[in-house]
Every structure is written in C-alpha cells, then in structure tokens.
A protein has these predicted regions:
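Helix-coil boundary and interhelical linker segments in multi-pass alpha-helical membrane proteins
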Residues: 1-4, 30-47, 88-103, 152-160
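A cytosolic-side transmembrane-helix exit/cap motif
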Residues: 42-48, 92-101, 120-131, 179-192
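Cytoplasmic-side transmembrane-helix entry/capping segments in multi-pass membrane proteins
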Residues: 45-48, 70-82, 104, 129, ...
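C-terminal ends of transmembrane helices
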Residues: 57-70, 117-126
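Small-residue-rich segments of transmembrane alpha-helices in multi-pass membrane proteins
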Residues: 77-89, 133-147, 195-198
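Mid-bilayer segments of alpha-helical transmembrane spans in multi-pass integral membrane proteins
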Residues: 82-90, 100-121, 143
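Short, highly charged, low-complexity non-transmembrane loops/tails of multi-pass membrane proteins
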Residues: 183-215
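Long, low-complexity, intrinsically disordered segments
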Residues: 209-243
Length: 243
C-alpha cells in the first residue's frame, strides 16, 4: 500500500464507522460524475449507487429516533467495519494482496473506532436526564462525513488529519459525557429518594396526629355519653328511693 493511498484508506474507514452508506454513495457519485481517479469503478455502478442511496435513506430516518438509533448502531457494529475494510481494499486495488490486506486492516480498524465513538455518544445522549436532540446530533454527523469525504477529493492528507482529530475528540467527548451522565443520574436518584423519604415522613406524621386526636376523643366521649339522655345511674337510684 503506497503512502498516497493511506489518507484515502484512513479517511474512508473513519467515515464508514459513522455512516457507511453515505460514504459509499458519496464516493460513487464523485467517481461517476466528478471523475475522481482514486474511486474504484465498482462503486460507480448504478446498482451500487441505488442500493447505497436506499440504505442511506433508511439510516437517515432511523438514526434520528431515540433508542432506535442505538439499536441500529448495534446491528451495524459488524457492518460498518466490514464496509470500511472493503472500501479500503478496493481503494488499494493495485497494491497487491499484501497491500490490500494492510489497507483493509487500517480501514476496518478506523471504522470500528469511529463506530464505537458514535454508538457511545448516542447511548450517552439517549440515557442522559438532560434534554438533547438526536436529530441535531445525527445531522451533525451526516454533515461532518459529507464534508470530510468532499475534502478528501481535493486534499486527502488534510482530510485524514481532520478525521484523526475528530476521532480523538470524539473519544474524549464520550468519556466526558458518560461521566456527566453518571453524575446527573446519581443526583436524580438522590432527589427522588429525598422526595420519597419526605413523603414517607409526612405520612407517618399525619397518622400520628390522627391517633392522638382519636385518643383524646375516647377520653372525653364516656362522660358526655353519661350526660346525654338522663342515663346517670345515681339519679336513677335517687328517684327509686323517693318512690
């Protein structure tokens, strides 16, 4: 694998880990209509472009729905690295068997790394108690992939450097976000437990007040009962004696 192919291999691998179908579609369009020499002819075929466009449209929707996006990412844990490795091998088509194998390894590893960052970031967004927009995050990812692949057409090394920076930044961001999510969840649990304890204490206080009031009523009612209806035993005895 020549040095001139390395930026293409790494960039396409990184982008495939974020949105593999967009990469296949963009490279095919650039090769077919932009006459980019580095793009393999197999990616320019109509059936490949049509299939990539259909899958890209499906991912465009699924990737913007909370929790559906995480399920989609789980399914593509294998798919994206495989596509990244396949694209890298196609890009290194004239490099021989060893060169293709090395390119596939680099592309697959880059795709797996960026996919892990994407999946971790999205899972952090979905489980965070703080409001966050999946649509905004997904749209940002799509635009970033399109921008980096477009830059690779004119400045491959600059695009590869940008992809490396984005990968490192993504890893750091996932770590920070997960720490914030864990802290926010602990605070939320603490507030929930505090409200539960306060409610339980209030219920016990109310029941204690009811018991005290009931005891007081029992202490006064017997005397009142004797006064009502002339039921005093002493009065009855006096009336019997006088008779």
């Amino acid at each position: 694998m020549g040095a001139e192919l390395l930026p293409w291999v790494f960039t396409s691998g990184w982008a495939s880990g974020v949105n593999a179908y967009a990469v296949v579609l963009l490279l095919g369009l650039f090769g077919r209509f932009g006459h980019v020499a580095e793009v393999p002819a197999s990616l320019e075929r109509t059936d490949v472009l049509a299939a990539a466009a259909i899958m890209f449209a499906i991912e465009l929707v699924a990737d913007k729905i909370p929790y559906v996006d995480s399920a989609w990412d789980s399914i593509h844990t294998v798919v994206r690295p495989v596509i990244g490795a396949a694209l890298a091998a196609l890009l290194a088509g004239d490099a021989g068997t060893l060169g293709q194998a090395l390119a596939a390894g680099v592309g697959g590893a880059a795709a797996l790394a960026s996919h892990s960052v994407k999946a971790g970031l999205r899972l952090a967004v979905n489980t965070s108690p703080e409001p966050a927009s999946n649509v905004a995050v997904s749209a940002g990812e799509d635009l970033t992939v399109a921008g980096v692949i477009s830059l690779a057409v004119v400045q491959p090394w600059l695009a590869a450097a940008l992809a490396a920076v984005l990968l490192a930044t993504g890893i750091a961001l996932v770590v920070v976000l997960w720490r914030r999510v864990q802290l926010a969840r602990r605070r939320w649990r603490a507030r929930r437990d505090g409200r539960a304890r306060a409610s339980a204490n209030g219920g016990r206080a109310a029941r204690s007040g009811a018991w005290v009031g009931s005891d007081r009523n029992h202490a006064t009612n017997p005397a009142e009962g004797r006064d009502v209806g002339g039921s005093d035993p002493a009065g009855s005895d006096r009336r019997a004696s006088s008779a």
